[in-house]
Amino acid sequence: MKRHHFYFFILFFVLSVNCKAQWRIEAESEATRVLLRGDTLDITAPKGLSLWWETPLTAPCTIEYRACVVVEGGPCDRLSDLNCFWMASVPVAGKAVSPLLNSVKATGRFVDSYRLQCYYLGFGGNYNTTTRFRRYNADTLAITDEAHRPPILKEYTDSAHLLKPNHWYSVRIEVHTDGLTCYYIDDELLVDYHDPSPLTYGWFAFRTTWSHTRLTGWKVIYEKSE
């Protein structure tokens, strides 16, 4: 049977307040600022921040955006933590529940993210000394017990795979129905993980802490076949 491919696009160009409202801020500090500057979100986070796209994602899909860590002498201009969660949810009674629900504890603290099941990539974490990929398993014991924290599945520590100041990175994340998820940055494949228990439905969040970052060109591409 002939296969036809249909591409459905959800585009976020940050052109209006309505578009900005598609993002939900989960911040540890009340001093956090997410401002709209032209076609770009300008994010100042004195402490932990998860910026959630409110619409859930379903595999197969591709996530694309451009991001920059600003180092221009400001109080939060620290070169670190261009991170993200994808296909994130809170499992409740066998169902994938939105991390944005009021019933879900969301403080902006990084340790509270262990309540999620998701994929996580920390690019230039730990003061720009590591780039790491993990799969979170919603083990809430990990919040207080390091022994329960998810293992590192992929790690880079060389300078070629750490952050450069004021550089605009192109990020592409692919989620396939067969359990494969891929993370590319500037067209370089950093992660190709085959998950034996695939996460095919969930939410995306841009994650950072104590930094000044910019985000633009948000796009989700769905491919469906028949």
Residue positions per predicted region:
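Carbohydrate-binding surfaces in secreted/extracellular proteins
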Residues: Y65, L162-Y193
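Flexible glycan-contacting loops in extracellular carbohydrate-active proteins
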Residues: Y193-T216
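Bacterial Sec-dependent N-terminal signal peptides
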Residues: M1-Q22
